[in-house]
Design a protein with these regions (language model features):
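Nucleic-acid endonuclease domains
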Residues: 1-67, 73-141
């Protein structure tokens, strides 16, 4: 079962506004991205999982806890991109304007190994379905 996390009200308003804009302007996407989504994911994961955030733009990892460093990714899509391997990877997916789910919370190496080839921008993509399969395999192992 996937853990669901309520989004803080200011974040929910952002996603509700994008849904309203998409309804007003059919065929246009108003997808939050970049630093905004990264920062949202970091604070949501930190609160939900008891993580301590590093200062902004910490290379490789966004947070830590008693077990070590954590990289955090948030998406509303079907995949994430990674620049490098990490110790622990937490991936969240926005499932509604009010809620996100934890898709993956585990070791970074299996995700890095399963990610696609390096792209021109230096990133490797991995689908959420692959991450779910990795999580399920490590849970049953």
């Amino acid at each position: 079962m996937t853990k669901r996390i309520p989004l803080p009200e200011p974040v929910a308003r952002i996603y509700k506004a994008t849904a309203e804009l998409e309804a007003l302007y059919p065929g246009r996407k108003f997808t939050p991205d970049g630093h905004l989504v990264g920062s949202i994911g970091e604070v949501i994961a930190a609160e939900a999982l008891g993580l301590t955030l590093y200062p902004m733009s910490q290379p490789g990892h966004d947070a830590f806890d008693a077990n070590g460093d954590v990289q955090i990714k948030l998406t509303a899509g079907k995949s994430i991109a990674m620049y490098a391997c990490c110790v622990r990877l937490v991936v969240l997916r926005v499932v509604s304007p009010e809620e996100a789910e934890i898709v993956y919370d585990g070791a970074g190496q299996p995700a890095w190994d399963a990610a696609g080839a390096m792209q021109k921008n230096g990133q490797r993509a991995i689908s959420l379905s692959k991450l779910r399969a990795i999580a399920a395999a490590s849970f049953t192992a």
